[in-house]
Amino acid sequence: MKFITMRNKKNTMDKYMKLIIQMPCYNEAETLNIALDALPRTLEGIDCIEYLIINDGSRDDTLQAARQWGVNYIVNFKQNKGLAKGFMAGIDGCLCQGADIIVNTDADNQYCAEDIHKLIEPILRGEADIVVGARPIDKTAHFSPVKKKLQHFGSWVVRKASNTQIPDAPSGFRAYSREAAMRMNVVNDYTYTLETIVQAGREKIPMTSVPVRTNGELRPSRLFNSIWGYVKKSMITIIRAYMMYKPLKCFTFLCIPPIL
């Protein structure tokens, strides 16, 4: 992994709030400029906005597109490491560059960047340390009926496992305070979205959700290309995350069937 500083803007204020918006990327050359152009340049309560790209071993021109656009930082993997590892590498990079708030969004432009202000407002007000953007799943045209049901079911399972009320657990459109980001520790290789909610819920990190909008689909989802593969991997992720905080309960539950 290589961390590349493209441009570091200096703020002359003694105290200021820095927001870094990060985007995990894998072969996103066709959509990256669209997603980057949509990002805010200024936000109320924020003195400095910077942009970080995680190039997860892309085989296209993603890296060149990020450089030409002028992002501040690039975390560059020579080989594909997967979404979870890319997310954590981005978080580490944002923390190293002094981010007070970190927003994670997707390079396929599925999330409406105009709603980033909604994500950071609860953090700025001191009401939460993690804010998850809740998509209008039932109104999202490019979601199939099966995908909508699985999204709702998966979110319900995560709510039970995490003891939280987050309505859209798979959403990757999120904001983290510096304090929350420093406590994140993703151990699975598949996705960070479910595990981080379970972790935050069990560690009692203040977390909330806000409604956000979505854009039209620019490319098919790479995580959801196999329905049952998605379900299997998601359930394994949730169980592993839950076992980290409730090992005795999980062990007891798994031992009941053989005993009976």
Specify the residue positions occupied by each region the protein language model found.
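Hydrophobic helical membrane-anchoring modules
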Residues: 2-17, 187-260
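Residue-level preference for short helical/loop micro-motifs built around acidic side chains
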Residues: 30-34, 60-64, 81, 85, ...
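Short hydrophobic beta-strand elements that form part
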Residues: 20-24, 36, 53
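A conserved acidic beta->alpha catalytic loop
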Residues: 55-63, 109
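Short beta-strand/loop segment that forms part of the nucleotide-sugar
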Residues: 47-57
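Acceptor/aglycone-binding surface of glycosyltransferases and processive sugar-polymer synthases
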Residues: 73, 77-96, 101-103, 113-190, ...
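Short, well-formed alpha-helical segments that are part of the catalytic scaffolds
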Residues: 28-42
